[in-house]
Amino acid sequence: MLRTSIASSRPLLPSSVCPKAPAQWLCTSRARRVNTATRRYHALARKSNAGRRCSLTPNTATTSQFFQKAASSTSTKPPGPSDADVRSPASPSSRSSLRPESIPKPPQSPPVQGQTSPGSEVLPPDHESSTPPPPPGPKSSRLRKLLYLFLTAGLAYAGGVWYSLRSDNFYDFFTEYIPYGEEAVLYLEERDFRNRFPHVTKQINRRVTVPKDEGAQVTIPSGSGLSWKVAEEQQEATDMTKKGRRMGTAHANEPTKDIKVAEKAKEEVKSKSAAKKEDVAANIPIQEALEPQPAKTEEKNLEAPRQPAVPAVTAIERLVQDKADEPVVQDLVKVFNDVISVISADESASKFAGPIAKAKEELQRIGDRIVALKKDAQESAQEEIRNAHAAFDKSAAELIRRIDEVRTQDAAEFREEFESEREKIARSYQEKVNTELQRAHEVAEQRLRNELVEQAIELNRKFLSDVKTLVENEREGRLSKLAELSANVAELERLTAGWSDVVDINLKTQQLQVAVDAVRTTLENSDVPRPFVRELAAVKELASNDEVVAAAIASISPAAYQRGIPSAAQLVDRFRRVASEVRKARLLPENAGITSHAASLVLSKVMLKKQGLPTSDDVESILTRTENFLEEGNFDEAAREMNSLQGWAKLLSKDWLADVRRVLEVKQALEIIETEARLRCLQVE
């Protein structure tokens, strides 16, 4: 029934979770049967873990619950292609409760027929004789995910450490925000440095692990402490400037036993540490000389509880190093001066005067030795630098020589290649030029042949045309001549008509010229003014279509051609009469009376006439210039001069000016008409 419920609930599963398959016992294919058995195995495992018994008559609730478990197990681990060979286990009974871990693996033997439950009536099909592998055990996806997470985190961490060694920006980020990132990067950098420079690390380790020589053990004698004789112990420290009991100076210059022991220990230490470096050997005697002093002080304090009444304190001079520009020497001097300050503050400072003095000498020698070593090191460094410079110069010269050789060799090779390429290019260019010339020659020859053919064709066409023309001429001999004669006659008629028009125009022009001459003759030959209305009417009739002539005639005053105009002689004669009257009135003002007229008349008789061409603007000068213009026949300028008069002189010459204007108007009109007649003649020609 369990298998039946699985088969009935399988079509309800989505296609993405489990592919659709037919019923379990209706399948004939071996692969489908084994795949169905695998799904049933997982379903049984889920069912047994739940601790429930299978019912022979499944209901809807049981089927839906089993469907949910089968779907979860299928989605957790879908069967793969390798599950097709898994053998189908025997079907359990309705009351059986199995766990997946309690199911034993089947042996590698031919499978037997499947068993059915007591209530089942369907018999299982026979399995084929095959040896499938044992069913795989359930795998834990959580452990696999955790393993993948650890591997991914480890790879990411290793990649971050590796990239931190390559990028400075990522190094800052990695060491600041990633735990233990800085330690990992520093460890890799240190390993890389040791791999690149193994000798440097060896020297550092060797220098650090050098054992420190403690020197010989110093033994303090029993009598080197304080004594009950205060005066003898304070002989060297007696202050002669203070009041009180003076101590003897018999033993003032004798060194104490402690100083002797310290000097002996110092000599032993120097003999043992002679093979060490000078900077280490210089520090050891000072330490050995100063180490016993605190013990002595304690012993004295224990043995002599009483202090002298007036202890004499002797100040020890501080060490002054002339060559204290070295850091090591400065540190030594500072430490030694601190020791001196401590000893000077003690009451028994006089006991350490000797060791301090020798220590000063040792420090002085050490400073000198350090300076000498530094100088030697500088000299050796300079020598090495000079040697390196010489070697570099030699190597550079050798390199330059090699480069020159290679350059020369390359230049020769390039020159050879250039020559060969140039020859190839010249050869190819010459071949190309020859080919082009040959083609051009062939094209020119073909063009000449074509031109010759065209000329031959043109000559044949021209010959045929000439023959045809000759034939036509011979055929139409007289007819062609008649046509030519008719054309000539038509041309003559056209020319005759044109010349008739020219003759008419010339005739009218001549008539107009004759009429103008008649008007001029009438005006010049008359002694008195005569009207010339008929002559002017004849001119107007001949030039009826000419606007210029009509305008010139219209510009003449009607009084001029109706009454006539005076001649030149008449104008000159009248001017003389007018000039005599003007001279009489030339001195009159505008509002002159009878007395002024009489005075002007009298004075005019006295005044002399001017001759020539005067340039002034008085009345006499104007009259003289006007008379000269009239004698020359220049009436226009004469009228201009008379028009410039003022007052009574202009008033007296007003009538004469009007006659001169009419004469000038008529002359100007006649000149315009004559000019127009000449223009007509020129147009016809």
UniProtKB/Swiss-Prot annotation:
> A single Pfam family, by name?
Mitofilin
Task: Indicate, by first and last residue, each region the UniProt record lists as having compositional bias (Low complexity).
Answer: 87-101
| Record membrane topology | Single-pass membrane protein
According to its UniProt record, where is this protein located? Mitochondrion inner membrane
Instruction: Give the UniProt keywords, A-Z.
Output: Coiled coil, Membrane, Mitochondrion, Mitochondrion inner membrane, Transit peptide, Transmembrane, Transmembrane helix
Mitochondrial intermembrane compartment residues: 166-685
- Superkingdom field: Eukaryota
Q: Main subcellular localization, coarse class? A: mitochondrion
KW Magnesium (keyword) present: no
Identify the stretch annotated as signal peptide in this record: none
Transit peptide residues are 1-42
What is a single cellular component term in the Gene Ontology annotation? MICOS complex
Side Mitochondrial matrix, residues? 43-145
Q: Where is the composition biased (Polar residues)?
A: 66-77
What are the TM regions of this chain, as residue ranges?
146-165
Which GO terms are recorded in the biological process aspect for this UniProt protein? Answer: cristae formation
The record's region (Disordered) falls at 66-140, 283-307
Where would one find coiled-coil regions in this protein? 356-494
Query: Main role?
Result: Component of the MICOS complex, a large protein complex of the mitochondrial inner membrane that plays crucial roles in the maintenance of crista junctions, inner membrane architecture, and formation of contact sites to the outer membrane. Plays a role in keeping cristae membranes connected to the inner boundary membrane. Also promotes protein import via the mitochondrial intermembrane space assembly (MIA) pathway.
Q: Tell me, how does this one assemble?
A: Component of the mitochondrial contact site and cristae organizing system (MICOS) complex.
Q: Give the UniProt family note.
A: Belongs to the MICOS complex subunit Mic60 family.
Q: What is the name attached to this protein's record? A: MICOS complex subunit MIC60
Q: Which organism is it from?
A: Ajellomyces capsulatus (strain G186AR / H82 / ATCC MYA-2454 / RMSCC 2432) (Darling's disease fungus)
